[in-house]
Amino acid sequence: MYRYLAKALLTSRAGPAALGSAANHSAALLGRGPGQPAAASQPGLALAARRHYSELVADREDDPNFFKMVEGFFDRGASIVEDKLVKDLRTQESEEQKRNRVRGILRIIKPCNHVLSLSFPIRRDDGSWEVIEGYRAQHSQHRTPCKGGIRYSTDVSVDEVKALASLMTYKCAVVDVPFGGAKAGVKINPKNYTENELEKITRRFTMELAKKGFIGPGVDVPAPDMNTGEREMSWIADTYASTIGHYDINAHACVTGKPISQGGIHGRISATGRGVFHGIENFINEASYMSILGMTPGFRDKTFVVQGFGNVGLHSMRYLHRFGAKCIAVGESDGSIWNPDGIDPKELEDFRLQHGSLLGFPKAKPYEGSILEIDCDILIPAATEKQLTKSNAPRVKAKIIAEGANGPTTPEADKIFLERNILVIPDLYLNAGGVTVSYFEWLKNLNHVSYGRLTFKYERDSNYHLLMSVQESLERKFGKHGGTIPIVPTAEFQDSISGASEKDIVHSALAYTMERSARQIMHTAMKYNLGLDLRTAAYVNAIEKVFKVYSEAGVTFT
């Protein structure tokens, strides 16, 4: 076991900095004034050093316990924010009583509240019987319903679903989505089952969750995750609505990520990848951060590598490519490909759909080494947890690590990246696009109307009336003999003049959510002199928000 010392949290080595105001801002990010050298210690170290939340951090080896990993990151954030939480309490208590209250609530937040472990039989198409194992973890009910995906994988375990559920709690808090965290897993390899068998498994798993009170529009709302998608979510919604929810008008809000015909929402499939893009965008366009990394702001001419070509990896690659970045390598479980001149995401997607693999793609070469160690500007781990470890972290050459996956970086690797001035954009912020748009879908299901349906024509007519009013006013003032002065909208305005579609509203709301949350993280990082430690800043924000709910609701019956 090891302890993160406060000094490591509150200081950071300075990298190359640009001249002018950007350099001064960078110095502030690194916890010192303009023109001052990096200090050996920072104000507040004496207080932070005696805090004890970081005692239970993950093991030192390369394969730490996943749930302990998340708890360790939580402890880092808690050790930073404890004094502020005590100071902000508005109760008639002594300093010691306030501190005890704060520590008590933090202990309430940290553990996983409920874990359901179940098994059930299915009859396979060949007549044989098989027992299927599954889990659903609910980390926190400070907000309900709980929210989190369902994954199908042979690697599913109790530890994994607990860790992912806890990440969901903090993720929702970071982006101000009013859900508690949850996660489910079914221990199968879906490639080994027919569609009929997968439908049996999905529907039976739904019934088992329903019998135990682990699914429902106001209780617990699953979503797609690894190896699940619209098809499985549709089966879940239909099963719930046809059985336990048959009297519930909101039954289809029991799950998100559904097809449009089943109450889904436009923009949900690409939401996580689009959120990854917006998350990177908010930091790569910030000159103060880029000066620390020795990079110029913007995506243009930046190179990136994607590990994992699933839903998240594909859509992240699409959006970065669209805005001028160049993908030079893509890795999957069966191999990796590389082309220093760039890989087109549409061509690669079409090839994989046709051949079932990335290998053999004619416009790239097979890559035998570790894709995580390729020299690039941005590395996007979008596969599974614990990919960046103490062993390979020193060899990572990317300047920005954008965590599209959940938990891809171990605590030891995270520490190494901080020491090397590598900017890690953390998972609990960066891949929150999926749950954000799931929230929009859930609201759509409860409201029983699609976004824009009630205002679409009104907005269109209002826009045209506005343009006609301007045109007529100009003609009366400046027109000769009643001549026309046509008002010609710009291309951008012309695209939106007819009114916002559901997809437009979803994309705009997602971009705003990611921008607002990024600003909150930047502000917290500067406030606590965290340097490039955005992960701790994000956890601090999440802890403050969850703490506020518990504190103001009262904890007598918690």
Swiss-Prot record:
Give the UniProt keywords, A-Z: ADP-ribosylation, Mitochondrion, NADP, Oxidoreductase, Transit peptide
Annotated catalysed reactions: L-glutamate + NAD(+) + H2O = 2-oxoglutarate + NH4(+) + NADH + H(+); L-glutamate + NADP(+) + H2O = 2-oxoglutarate + NH4(+) + NADPH + H(+)
Major location, coarse class? mitochondrion
Q: Name one Pfam family in it.
A: ELFV_dehydrog_N
Q: Name one GO biological process term.
A: glutamate catabolic process
Q: What is its EC number?
A: 1.4.1.3
Q: Which residues are annotated with the PTM ADP-ribosylcysteine?
A: C172
GO MF term list: glutamate dehydrogenase (NAD+) activity; glutamate dehydrogenase (NADP+) activity
Q: Which domain of life is it from?
A: Eukaryota
Residue positions annotated to bind substrate are K84
- Please indicate if the UniProt record lists GTP-binding as a keyword: no
| Location of this chain's protein in the cell | Mitochondrion matrix
In the database record, which residues form the transit peptide?
1-53
An example GO CC term for this entry is: mitochondrion
Mind telling me which SUPFAM superfamilies this protein's record contains? Aminoacid dehydrogenase-like, N-terminal domain (SSF53223), NAD(P)-binding Rossmann-fold domains (SSF51735)
- What happens to this protein after translation, modification-wise? Stoichiometry shows that ADP-ribosylation occurs in one subunit per catalytically active homohexamer.
Active-site residues? K183
Q: Which SMART domains match?
A: ELFV_dehydrog
Report the function annotation for this chain. Important for recycling the chief excitatory neurotransmitter, glutamate, during neurotransmission.
Tell me the protein family, please: Belongs to the Glu/Leu/Phe/Val dehydrogenases family.
Q: Which PANTHER family match?
A: GLUTAMATE DEHYDROGENASE, GLUTAMATE DEHYDROGENASE 2, MITOCHONDRIAL
The record's subunit annotation is:
Homohexamer.
What's the name of the protein?
Glutamate dehydrogenase 2, mitochondrial
Native source species:
Pan troglodytes
* Species classification: Eukaryota, Metazoa, Chordata, Craniata, Vertebrata
Gene name, Swiss-Prot/TrEMBL: GLUD2
